[in-house]
Amino acid sequence: YCLIAALLCAIVGAIGSVSIDSLDFWPLLADWFSEQFSTGVLIVPCMLTLAIPGVLPRFKAEQMMPAIALIVSVIASVVIGGAGSLAFPLPALIWCAVRYTPQVTCLLTFVTGAVEVVLVANSVIDISVGSPFSIPQMFSARLGIATMAICPIMVSFSVAAINSLMKQVALRADFDFLTQVYSRSGLYEALKSPSLKQTQHLTVMLLDIDY
């Protein structure tokens, strides 16, 4: 949908800009398309997953490592430069996709992509390299950032789907289908919970009723 919407917006924008800018139709079409596509890929997933959390979870120090790695990778992109530096945050974003929820992953991807677009536009990240094609730098940068942004979002939703299936499997294994109470194996696993203190005495009575 983002690709189709970006193409339609690019056609309308290029036609309307021909009489204003001194460029031809095709360079304007490429510029409009790259801008609309990168913006859509970054913003639309973030808006679709946006929600107000009911209870703010407690973050531990080790849970912040993917976000810290993401910040370090963006700084490395600025320091090293070059066209390949735009892909430096990709491993950190995939790490975030594995560890965080889709909502947090989409938000981090949006912020990272927006920061990289601003840095490239202001020449903070220098991606100027010799190329046999006369392609504007921002066109290449926008498409590269949009492509990078798709990967962690796909991983995040794949991990969320796998976790949902695992919860369904655990629910069927640990709970009785009719009564929705613990099965024998589920009760044993619950009793192994580390929240139960070792000094705490506990009496368990099992009543197995055939139905």
Where do the model's predicted regions map?
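Conserved nucleotide-binding and Mg2+-coordinating catalytic segments in signaling enzymes
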Residues: A170-A190, L207-D210
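Cell-envelope/extracellular polymer assembly enzymes that use nucleotide-activated donors
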Residues: T203
